[in-house]
Structures are given as structure tokens and as C-alpha cells.
Amino acid sequence: MTEVDLNSDMGEGFGPWTIGDGVDAAIMPLISSANIATGFHAGDPSSMRRTVEMAAEHGVAIGAHPGFRDLVGFGRRHIAAPAIELVNDMLYQLGALREFARLQGLSLQHVKPHGALYMHLARDEVAARLFVETLQRLEPELLLYCMPGSATWRIGRELGQPLVREFYADRDYDRSGSIVFTRRVAALDPQQVADKVLRACREGKVRTVEGEDLDIAFDSVCIHSDTPGALELVASTRARLEGAGIRIKAPR
């Protein structure tokens, strides 16, 4: 691998509240793609505008990061709802961010569902299909960030939606290739995370929670900005990759 996307979730505060270490401004110049919170799990109109402006300043590609309607739970609680309701909620959020992007003369590069909604679409064939079918009608060239092997990935391939496969630097994997979902993420060692990412890029392997090596293929590395010590994780990972001759570059 000679180049890889490095993405992070941005703008995940709300009004006067900040999620994580409040280091968006320091992380933004280090990443190539930003997933911007669109108001349902986090974010508000003012934070969306500020985050788009910050991404534009640093030449970072932007994407919508729609979540469940769950500000209290930060979008990490599953909400049982019909597929059409979930897709309508995602379209609403996508449209909101698109206008702030247009204000800066930008287009959205991608969409990446957040948290529990991301995992719901990864498992629910009906919701994933309706979402991808809707994207095909609305914006068939919009990149869809997803987990390899998920329902989103399978249906996206089937219908021809362009996909970006993700590798999670700050999450554990199990032997099935799924990320181990958690509501509380512990602090991680930046050098260990950088080593994990470099090995995945060079060898296409990651160590699972069962202690086994798992083959992994991906186009983008995700480090969540709300993970404790996120700035150090992003900085160490970028430095390690660039030191190994791997360029950090957005998919488009």
C-alpha cells in the first residue's frame, strides 16, 4: 500500500458542550477526510458551519456523519425504527450539511453513518438496501464509507455505489471481522495504535480480541476524535505511515 485515507469524526459537540478532548482544530490538518456530525447524535448548525470552514482551510475532504436521533446517548444507543424512517432521517442530515458545504463552494465527498446506526446498517439488509437505493437515486457517485463484509458493503457492491472500506485504528476486531462495539473507549497507547495501522497497511493483517491474525482489506483508516488522547493517536499514526513511505490522501 502506497497511500491511504485517514479519516476522523469532527464537529461532535453541541452548543457549549464538547465531546472528547476538544481537539478538532489540531486534528483537522492531520487527516485527509472529515466525517462531520449533522445534528442528530451531535453537532448543530453553527458547529457544522465552523467544521466545514475548518476543513476547507486545510484542504480536507468532507462527508456527512448522520446518526440516530439520540443526543443524550451520543448516537450509541440502538433505536428501533422502520427502514424508511431511518433513511429519511439520514437524508435530512445529509441535506443540511450539503448546504453548508455549498456555502464554501464545496461538494460532499462521502457519507458515513455514525455509531449504532453504522452498526445497524451493517447488519440490517432491508435498511441498508433502502439507504443505498436512495443514494443511487440522489447521488450515485457519493462515496459510502462502510465496514468490509457488512450488509452495507455487499449491497453497495451489488448496486454499484462507490465504497470506501474502513479500518478502525482505535477499535478491536473479533474473528468474524466485526469491530467490537463499546460505549466507553479506554485510552490507548499511540505507538501501539500506529504499529497496528502500519502492520495492517503493509501486511493486511490485524490481531483480534481472540489473539488470532485476521486478514483485512481497506481504503481508509479511522481514528475517532472522541477517543481519549485522539490527537496523539492521529499524530503518531500519520507520522508512522509517512515515515514508512505511505502517503495520506483522500479517496478523491
UniProtKB/Swiss-Prot annotation:
Keyword field contains ATP-binding: yes
Record's catalysed reaction(s): 5-oxo-L-proline + ATP + 2 H2O = L-glutamate + ADP + phosphate + H(+)
Keywords: ATP-binding, Hydrolase, Nucleotide-binding
One Gene Ontology term from the biological process aspect of the record: carbohydrate metabolic process
Listed EC numbers: 3.5.2.9
Pfam families membership: LamB_YcsF (PF03746)
This protein's record includes keyword Nucleotide-binding: yes
Subunit: Forms a complex composed of PxpA, PxpB and PxpC.
Protein name listed in UniProt: 5-oxoprolinase subunit A 1
Species this protein is from: Pseudomonas aeruginosa (strain ATCC 15692 / DSM 22644 / CIP 104116 / JCM 14847 / LMG 12228 / 1C / PRS 101 / PAO1)
